[in-house]
Amino acid sequence: MPPKKSSARSKQQQPPKQPPKQPPNIDPGSSFTPESFEKELKNLAARAKDETWARWLLEQGSVYLRSSLLLGLVAVYANVSELTLSPVYGSIPVSIWHDRLVMAACFVGWACNLHLGRVLPVRMAYLLPLIALYIPVAQFYLFGLSGTLTAYHGPLITEALTLAPLIVLSVACTATYLDGADLSALPGFMRDASPGIASYFYYRLVEKLSAGLLARYVGSAIFQTRVVMEAVLGASYALVAPSRLLAFTLPALLHTAFLNTHVMTPMATRSLNSTLQANDWLLHDRKESLTGYISVADNLKTGYRVMRCDHSLLGGEWIRYKGARVAEPIYGVFTMLEGVRLVEVAEPVPDSEARALVIGLGIGTTPAALVAHGVDTTVVEIDPVVHEFASKYFQLPSNHTPVIADAVTYTADLVNTTTDQFDYIVHDVFTGGAEPIALFTLEFLQNLEALLKPDGVIAINYAGDFTLPPPKIIVHTIKQVFPSCRIFRENQRDEDVIEKEKRDFTNMVIFCVKTERPVTFRRATAADLLQSRTREHFLVPKHEVSDKDFMALEEPSVLRNNDTAALAKWHEKSALGHWEVMRTVLPDVIWEQW
């Protein structure tokens, strides 16, 4: 066992004791106090927290702003695309596939956003301005194939090659942006589905609102015309997603500015006229308006003038054969409507004391004749451009009362606010391949009945296919309001055409009175004919229609405001048949070069 060290030696080896340390003497007013450090740390923490919230708000705001901009732009573009196709195919054929194509493109874009992001050589957003600005170019050349593509497949193929790629990439970009949305505040079962659901309803909202605004303001300025709106939307995409690829849009911009004859500029109109004149046509004027693309053109070879609305004709008159008092119409049905004056009544009214209400103007054939007879005539027309062109380019006299308004609203107001009644009512509103449903409902016809004098006469023009239910439904509804009617076709029934083409498309005029007495016509006098050769042949109706001429087997229903499905479901077939008829009236190139 080792020896113990002495305690004395241990004491000698211990270091001397140091006096206790005193805290530093810090001035209480200095910034280096513990309290100041603690305060500074708290300030830094608060600032970091504020910066985190600001960054979060900025990031989330960017996500939703970019998403809403892209969805809003493509929703508006979809509506403009429909408008752009309607002069070539008509609004109803364009609508057949439009919604289904849009929904399919939205689904593909949303489901394949990650795959598209991987396979495309550049960012998806950079391609959007290129597609948007090249759409007018593609449409311009695809319209030239409309005769081959037909009204059923043409709109589908055209929008599949133009609008669909834009929707796919716009929705794919939106889905990618919304992946960065912070949805932690939502319940777990809603986080995955809410971006898609919210995007769908937002798209539909913008689509609906923009459709209403476009219908109201289209054509009111150059920047509110179809092709220019497409160019403006393309430029908006360029602002949302700028890149060096924008240099490749220059050819598209140059084509739209200098070669696209669908642009409503004087230079484009002159270029269009050079094409039309090579086909023996001359364009006088054109405008875009709330009912469609309106134009006035002459057939130089045959010598007549027509007014066009989208893919339909509102009427026409001969310019080679001038009438002495009124124009000579190219369609006999408009002179048949003047036969409303020939219906025998108990107490005939002199023309100088008679009043007439005309619903739908067209080129003004019937109103002009009524005015020529001295009848006080009021014309209700919804489209101001139609009235402008009828007054400027056709022989519509100025001494009539024009009402630029919706006929449904106008007649309802007239019934509710005045006791005015008319001796004659002429109802002529067909256009675009289908009837405006609201103007053939029981409620609208009841308003017309209230506006007709007890001994008055109404003439209703309807164009349709007698092999389909709509004509039967319309006539059945009319007879619920007017107890005595007779119906006449414009042309005689052609059994060979019916057998070959399986359709019987024609104009018919329904003459009705408010009493039970039979509808009969007095003999036309020389004064009734207005020195017109056309009226000699067509003023007095000839080809009467019987119940057996309506070939649809279905029992007709009454068309009401809240129950129009029975008629609406046949619009597509009627419009497609009307498109084919119009392509036999004018050549393809005239419809395509609008």
Regions found by a protein language model. Name each.
Residues 280-479, 483, 491-498:
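Soluble catalytic regions of membrane-associated enzymes that act on cell-envelope
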Residues 170-177:
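Intracellular juxtamembrane helix-capping segments at the cytosolic ends
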Residues 124-138, 159-166, 186-205, 249-257:
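Transmembrane alpha-helical segments of multi-pass membrane proteins
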Residues 1-5, 591-594:
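A positional/structural detector of protein chain ends, strongest at the extreme C-terminus
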Residues 111-121, 177-182, 238-243:
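Structural signal for the C-terminal ends of transmembrane alpha-helices
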Residues 2-168:
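Membrane-anchoring hydrophobic segments
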Residues 153, 181, 216-220, 373, ...:
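Residues at alpha-helix termini
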Residues 32-100, 183-193, 207-318, 323-332, ...:
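Soluble small-group transferase modules, centered on the S-adenosyl donor enzyme superfamily
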